[in-house]
Amino acid sequence: MKATSEAIESPKVRGSLGATVTRLVLGFTTLAVWIDNISKDFYDGENFPGFFDFQFRSPESEGGGNGSTLTFVQDILDATILQAPEFFGWILTFVELGIALSLIFGIFTRAGSIAAIGFFIGLFLVYFGGEEWIWTYVLLLGAAVAIFLDWGGRLLGVDQFIAKVKGESPFGLIW
């Protein structure tokens, strides 16, 4: 009987208020940034490459820059995203919106938090060594990890109902 009562009380089953608050704050923050980026045509094929150019340009150069120092990241971006910025701009548009909505509504929260972890690691690497305060991305990454580890969608989220109806998701990685 003790094992059953412990399982009922675990965050996996009942959720966590702390993870729920963190999930909502991170979700609304991501949505606000996404809306701002949309309003500035950030994801547009013509504007998107300029973001990466700015990140790796020296702050002392004409027009300034962030001065990121991880040249291997720049090489990867040059060989992938910057070869098809319009395509990857659209991909990022939907990935960032998907992360925000997943976190806000608590639907497929574990998958959304895994996507957020990858997204924030990417931002950390792009900004690393530059003028930007890098710890912002560490905090965002930490929040996404906490949401994943504490089953952030199991309280006040759609995942709570999905888990009751369907049981556990494959490998516990979706809801």
Q: What do these predicted ranges mean?
A:
Residues 1-98, 105-175:
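Extended, low-polarity transmembrane helix blocks
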